[in-house]
Amino acid sequence: GCGTGRYCSVFKAYGWPVVHGYEGTPDITSLGVYNDIMTLDLTKKRWVGIEYDLVMSLEVGEHIPKEYEHTFIENVCEFASKDLILSWAVPGQGGKGHVNEKENDDVIDHVILKGFRFQKKLSKDLRSRAGLKWFKNTIMVFRRG
C-alpha cells in the first residue's frame, strides 16, 4: 500500500514518467498527498491491466493475514515487469497491525518461485542507506528473469 503517496511524489519529482500508487485503505485518496492513488485490495487476485518497470511494496506484507500472503506476493510480482523492491517486517520487529511477520529467507523463497532473482548486493546497499531502522533489516531487491 502506498499510504498517502509520499513515495509516489518523490518518484514523480525525480522525473519518473508514470507513477501510480495502490492502497488498501478505503477513501485514501481524500487523505493523499499524491493525486494518482487508487484503492486496491491485494489480498484478492487482481490485474490492473498494466505492468510496471518497478514495483515497490514497503512494509505491507506483515499486515496481510497469512492465508492471503501468496495472493499478495503473486499480485506484486505480476505487476512488476522488471524490478521489485519489497520489505516485510521480520519476526519480533513489532508494529501496529502486524499479523504476519516473516523471515527474509521465507519472502525471498516465495518471490524466487515467481520468476525473480534476489539481488543480494543491491539489497545490502539499499539497507545500508536506509534512514528508517527497520529497513536496515527488511529491504529486498529482486530482478525478473
What kind of feature is each model-predicted range?
Residues 129-145:
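Core SAM-dependent methyltransferase catalytic element
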Residues 31-34, 69, 95-99, 130-134:
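Short aromatic-enriched loop/helix-cap "lid" or pocket-rim segments at secondary-structure transitions
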Residues 1-92, 105-108, 143-144:
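Conserved SAM-binding loop
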Residues 89-97, 119:
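C-terminal alpha-helical "lid/dimerization" subdomain adjacent to the S-adenosyl-L-methionine
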Residues 15, 103, 135-138:
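Residues that flank catalytic or metal-binding motifs in active/ligand-binding sites
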Residues 45-47, 125-129:
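A short acidic, often aromatic-flanked loop/helix-cap motif at beta-alpha or helix-coil junctions
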Residues 116-127:
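Conserved S-adenosyl-L-methionine
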Residues 100-115:
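Short alpha-helix
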